[in-house]
From Swiss-Prot:
Name of encoding gene: Znf22
Family affiliation: Belongs to the krueppel C2H2-type zinc-finger protein family.
Organism: Mus musculus (Mouse)
Classification of source organism: Eukaryota, Metazoa, Chordata, Craniata, Vertebrata
Compartments in which it is found: Nucleus
Tissue: Expressed predominantly in developing craniofacial bones and dental organs, and in molar tooth germs of postnatal animals. Also detected in embryonic heart, liver, thymus, kidney, brain, lung, muscle and calvaria. In the adult, highly expressed in lung, kidney, bone and incisors.
Keywords: Acetylation, DNA-binding, Metal-binding, Nucleus, Repeat, Transcription, Transcription regulation, Zinc, Zinc-finger
Protein name: Zinc finger protein 22
A GO-annotated cellular component: nucleus
GO molecular function: DNA binding; zinc ion binding
Zn finger (C2H2-type) start-end: 55-77, 83-105, 111-133, 139-161, 167-189
PTM sites of type N6-acetyllysine: K18, K23
Length: 237
């Protein structure tokens, strides 16, 4: 006995075939934009869980977890910034970047910490802040196992292992591993520059410690410790 077709006039196998062909067509369209995808749509949730990034840019090989993110990324290569701020005229590739930028003008801070009530302009800043309360440190060093709450702190720490010093002083070419260390160092050059109060005023080259009341003891102490740099604190003739 022959089995009849299900209601609707289309067999189940034919329906599955059409769905498969539809996915293949979508895949071919996305591959034109440099996208690599999988046909199984049920994998999308699992991809997010394991940080899988199947959508790849053909221009720079950067990968993304969502096709919409790749589409926005490709605007970087085209150079088109279609989202413009009405207040200052600055343009952005993505509407989300414009929304974040607008908060500079409006002062809006929509992201609130439930623990302490502090508010933030960006959700990423709130996530970083919440780790103060939770103690979470997801960024770990492969060399020594030390963990940090922010990726920027891990990057700074890793320079203790690599010896990298990317911040260079323009005055003396001395290099530092952290920008804060460079800023602290730059004060040395500012202290050395002469400050004149009048036409016949004496030139002062003493460091800040002299002004703070630490006097000659502090300067003498620096001369003893530094040795070779003692000449920096001598008066000009």
């Amino acid at each position: 006995m022959r089995l009849g077709k299900p209601k609707g006039g289309i067999s189940r196998s034919a329906s599955q075939g059409k769905a498969y062909e539809s996915k293949r067509k979508t895949a071919r369209q996305r591959q034109k934009w440099g996208v690599a995808i999988r046909f199984d749509s049920g994998l999308s949730r699992r991809r997010r869980n394991v940080d899988e990034k199947p959508y790849k840019c053909a221009k720079c090989s950067k990968s993304f977890s969502q096709s919409s993110t790749l589409f926005q990324h490709k605007k970087i290569h085209t150079g088109k910034k279609s989202h413009k701020c009405a207040d200052c005229g600055k343009s952005f590739f993505q509407s989300s970047n414009l929304i974040q930028h607008r908060r500079i003008h409006t002062g809006e801070k929509p992201y609130k910490c439930d623990e302490c009530g502090e508010r933030f302009k960006q959700s990423s800043n709130l996530i970083q802040h919440q780790r103060i309360h939770t103690g979470e440190k997801p960024y770990c060093c492969d060399e020594c196992g030390r963990c940090f709450s922010q990726s920027s702190h891990l990057i700074q720490h890793q320079r203790t292992h690599t010896g990298e010093k990317p911040y260079q002083c323009e005055e003396c070419d001395k290099c530092f591993s952290q920008s804060s260390h460079l800023r602290q160092h730059m004060k040395v050059h500012k202290e050395k520059k002469p400050h004149k109060r009048g036409k016949n005023a004496r030139v002062k080259t003493h460091p800040v410690s002299w002004k703070r009341g630490k006097g000659r003891k502090a300067v003498a102490g620096i001369r003893q410790v530094k040795g070779a740099t003692s000449g920096l604190f001598k008066k000009k003739k």
